[in-house]
Amino acid sequence: GISVIVDAVFNHTGRDFFVFLDIQQNGWNSKYKDWYKNIRFDGKSPYGDNFSYEGWAGCMDLVKLNVDNNEVKQHIFGAVEKWITEFEIDGLRLDAADVLTGSFMEELHNFCYSKKQDFWLMGEVVHGDYNNWAKSGRLDSVTNYELYKGMWSSFNDKNFFEVAYSLNRQFGDGGIYKYAPLYNFLDNHDVNRIASVVKDSKFLIPLYAMLFTVPGVPSIYYGSEWGIRGMRNNYGDYEL
């Protein structure tokens, strides 16, 4: 069968989210003023709002949520419950999981598993120790960006030291992720398609053979099984 995993963005909202619009209209008197991180009413935002706020990774179009606020958690958990009961989803892929707080992930984990015992939680983690997120009580899996880089660059450079080092570091006898079910990939919606990254298309088959034989959870980005090409550029990522 097919499992449905929803891409969930709980770290931030856009500026057109109803909560942000209410703060724009009501300022200090908004009942939502504590929903975001570092809201201050003694200055202006770069967009001229009569308050300042924290943008995710410095991007002021993405307003960082205060996920440890009880009302924010209730709103998020209510949405998740609706997805489970009405659409029977099987899991969540947490966007920007590496900047969500541990306490939030633990509460989310407990809530989801109270609704569906075989629920699956995985997170987008780019930097840091994957064991901080992929562990009992938090997430079932996280993205393995370290191995991703090692796989394609080793083939392009025809020097397999990098991927050998990563595999041994992660999964060898003393591997730091030996028991962590990491989510392995060759491309996704945030990086260039592997068919455009490799210098020679003959590398694709051995790359996928490696993907499916290393420890962890293998994944194929839609269309990549056909060798679809695509690169990000200064105008966007529509090719991906």
Task: Show the residue positions of the predicted features.
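Loop/turn elements at helix/coil->beta-strand transitions in domains of secreted/extracellular proteins
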Residues: 2-5, 88-91, 116-120, 180, ...
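Substrate-binding cleft of secreted/luminal carbohydrate-active enzymes
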Residues: 208-229
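Substrate-binding/active-site clefts of carbohydrate-active enzymes
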Residues: 1-81, 86, 108-114, 131
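The substrate-binding groove and active-site-proximal loops of carbohydrate-active enzymes
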Residues: 15, 58-73, 90-99, 148-158, ...
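Short loop/turn motifs at secondary-structure junctions
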Residues: 87-88, 185
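Active-site-proximal helices and loops of the catalytic beta/alpha 8
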Residues: 20, 24-27, 79-81, 85, ...
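Catalytic grooves of carbohydrate-active enzymes
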Residues: 84, 188-190
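Conserved interdomain hinge at the start of the Helicase C-terminal
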Residues: 204-206
